[in-house]
């Protein structure tokens, strides 16, 4: 099994921790990562675009001129699509851009991305992130102790409320629980910091 260093909050090493090879030693799969990112970005689209068709445009209830005898083409409404100010034909309507992607593909994408972080030494495991109260300054101190200055993804458990509150106001820092780990935030992060308890939960879900 792959092993990485285990750190304390003060930046000192506290032994090593073994990683599950079925999660953190997976061969890079760019195809799965691409599909998963595409699907997640599509699901984030609001899809609230809309235009007015001829029934939604104000006015146009009266026939503009009589059917016959004027020499002009017959018309039934000045809000028909051929008129300036008329309704739009086949315009965009509100819809969801989300689509299904097999769960195994989504999990493979995350495992592939996590494995690359481990292989590139961008994966830091700490024995815990314990704070007596939410303090952004204290969390920033932990980042300095761990020599982390780049864009970082912090993974903590649901019980680590003070850590979540302490980190969420820091720039270039994203805080999630194991259930919130997804392909976008893993790929976007330049480094991942994860607590030992959160690591166990991630392995339990993905293994």
Swiss-Prot record:
SUPFAM superfamilies, sorted: Ribosomal protein L4
Biased composition (Basic residues): 60-71
A biological process from GO: translation
Gene Ontology CC annotation, any one: ribonucleoprotein complex
Record bears the keyword Protein biosynthesis: no
Function: One of the primary rRNA binding proteins, this protein initially binds near the 5'-end of the 23S rRNA. It is important during the early stages of 50S assembly. It makes multiple contacts with different domains of the 23S rRNA in the assembled 50S subunit and ribosome.
Assigned protein family: Belongs to the universal ribosomal protein uL4 family.
Protein name per the record: Large ribosomal subunit protein uL4
